[in-house]
């Protein structure tokens, strides 16, 4: 019977472990590097998207992507936070996709002072910043529609992912306004 606790067996196992770790680590490095090589595709995609702030991206297909700075650990963050945004942005909650926010000071939890999840603070901490982000995006979309139609902004309203001109009933989807809204600023 082979005893796996002898010094020779332990050294052999250590060598195998180190070799396997080096191969796996190299594979991870390659895996994370390859997506960065397609800059031309990213530039094309960016032309048709609207990124009004660090939290929100609206694509030409009407998809709203929300970056969430708190991990989902059963407390409902990936449900509650998108609902806050949907309400303020005036869009269908089902159209919001959630992605984890990257490490960045913009996503610091204001109650904790760091970008981390804890203390059941996600909704309390991000309630106001996300409502403000949604309102800003909505206002920029309304302004972009008003500029497109050459009408006053107060003649337009956002509702269920579209901007509607009240008098003429013309409608533009958020995705249709994304490129123009990306070049629009608030007064």
Language model features with spans:
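Beta-strand segments within the central parallel beta-sheet cores of soluble alpha/beta enzyme folds
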Residues: 38-40, 93-103, 153-161
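Conserved beta-alpha junction segments in alpha/beta enzyme cores
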Residues: 38-80, 84
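N-terminal export signals
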Residues: 10, 16-37
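Short, surface-exposed charged micro-motifs
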Residues: 55-57, 88, 148, 153-155
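N-terminal secretory signal peptides
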Residues: 1-12
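Alpha-helical support elements that line or immediately flank enzyme active sites
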Residues: 64-99, 124-148
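Glycine-rich and small/hydrophobic secondary-structure elements
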Residues: 110-149, 163, 167-186
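Flexible hinge/switch segments at interdomain interfaces of large molecular machines
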Residues: 56-59, 104-117
